Amino acid sequence: MMETEGAKIMNRQWKKYDQLMENCYLGIAGGDSVINEWNDCFDVLIQIIENERESNPDFGRELDLLDDETDYRHDVQGWLEDYLDELDMREMYPRLEAVCRKLLKIFDWKEEYPSEIRFMLASALGSQGKVEEARKYCENWEEQEKDNPLAAAA
């Protein structure tokens, strides 16, 4: 069966993502993780999702289903958790804020609620001195999720 041009492009993008992801982990293993590769990998992932949604608007609507839809070939959810941790560890709070906001926007969050991402966003805001914005964000979050201990802790 002949592969369409769109499928070829998507395969190249996934290969690029996989290579960048591998470089991220090799860097950690070697003790010299390069944050630009982590950032590039995230940007490629977002580009993949947006491109896939052009032909299939339901593609990857939920983060936990993204791995399922790709037959678990790319460990997207696990890599994203590691990326957020890497940004937090490096105290790259403006980028962490931007990444958290993008993740909250790009996925529907109906299957799984993004408590950890919301907590990291609140922390990133506070760490940047955006105390009032962080306070309002946390109050709104707690109002939406009265029984969520992470919302109360934020």
Report the location of each language-model feature.
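Solenoid-like repeat scaffolds
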Residues: A7-R12, T70, K102-E111, E139-D147
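Amphipathic alpha-helical repeat scaffolds of TPR domains
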Residues: W14-A29, G60, T70-M89, E112-S123
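TPR-repeat structural position
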Residues: G31-W38, Y93, V131
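Alpha-solenoid helical repeat scaffolds
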Residues: N39, D43-I46, E50, R101, ...
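Acidic, Ser/Thr- and Gly/Pro-rich intrinsically disordered linkers and low-complexity segments
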Residues: E50-R73
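Boundary/linker segments of alpha-helical solenoid repeat arrays
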Residues: E52-D58, K110-P114, E145-A154
